[in-house]
Amino acid sequence: MKNLLPFLTRVPIKGDFEKVREELWAFPLVALVSSALPTLVLYLKLPLSNVLAVLALYFTIGLLHLDGLADFADGVMVKGNRERKIKAMKDLNTGIAGLFAVVMVLFLQVYSLQLVPFYAIFLAELNSKLAMLLALATRKPLGQGLGAYFMERMNSGQLLGGFIFYAILLVPVVVYEQNALVSLLGLAFGGYAIKVALDNFGGINGDCIGAIAEITRAGTLLVVAFAGAYLGG
């Protein structure tokens, strides 16, 4: 996991980028680090804790995934064939679709965090990291960028390892609060985002993976918020 942290977070430790793709199974473990600061903010119930928690999250993980979300949305929403969509996604200028997607994801997270228990951000990050692993497991790269680089070493063993660590990290939260199981529904957002990427672009690149991570996290928080508000979760 040491090699993954500098890639998926802003934690100032040294890692070997060449070894990152050998540790894909550890994606879920990164959630322990990426969610630590925002979870603490929520636990302490600080004023405007929902806003501060989102700021703490992006302070930890950076804005790379949000940038990918913007590019992804621009590509998905443009009209035309697959080549035109890919061109729009790779355009350096952010369009209105990308801006809207980023604003909506931030809004959903900030609003949902008012309605969820303090550990929900950990569950959301756990789902987010697993969804990234599932995206790599498609082994359908778009171009020769980071997505293709990681997919070269993606295999059933790495995927199984990721699921095992996902379960190991989820179980203690469920023991603490059984209703935490509802967070599993958040993975549906990730699955849908993967399908959208494949349908629109025919493959998955780094921008798609970042978008999948953001959509899954926001979707998970939304599910947990609805469960808490309407189902007594």
Curated annotation (Swiss-Prot):
Transmembrane segments annotated in the record for this chain: 24-44, 46-66, 96-116, 117-137, 156-176, 184-204, 209-229
Reactions catalysed according to its record: alpha-ribazole + adenosylcob(III)inamide-GDP = adenosylcob(III)alamin + GMP + H(+); alpha-ribazole 5'-phosphate + adenosylcob(III)inamide-GDP = adenosylcob(III)alamin 5'-phosphate + GMP + H(+)
Cofactors named for this entry: Mg(2+)
GO CC annotation, single: plasma membrane
EC annotation from Swiss-Prot or TrEMBL: 2.7.8.26
Cystine pairs: none
Pathway(s) the chain acts in: Cofactor biosynthesis; adenosylcobalamin biosynthesis; adenosylcobalamin from cob(II)yrinate a,c-diamide: step 7/7
Any GO molecular function: cobalamin 5'-phosphate synthase activity
Biological processes annotated in GO: cobalamin biosynthetic process
Domain of life: Archaea
Membrane topology: Multi-pass membrane protein
Subcellular location: Cell membrane
Matching InterPro entries: CobS
Keywords assigned by UniProt, alphabetized: Cell membrane, Cobalamin biosynthesis, Magnesium, Membrane, Transferase, Transmembrane, Transmembrane helix
Family, as annotated: Belongs to the CobS family.
Function, in words: Joins adenosylcobinamide-GDP and alpha-ribazole to generate adenosylcobalamin (Ado-cobalamin). Also synthesizes adenosylcobalamin 5'-phosphate from adenosylcobinamide-GDP and alpha-ribazole 5'-phosphate.
Protein name (Swiss-Prot/TrEMBL): Adenosylcobinamide-GDP ribazoletransferase
Species in which this protein is naturally found: Thermococcus onnurineus (strain NA1)
Organism taxonomic ancestry: Archaea, Methanobacteriati, Methanobacteriota, Thermococci, Thermococcales
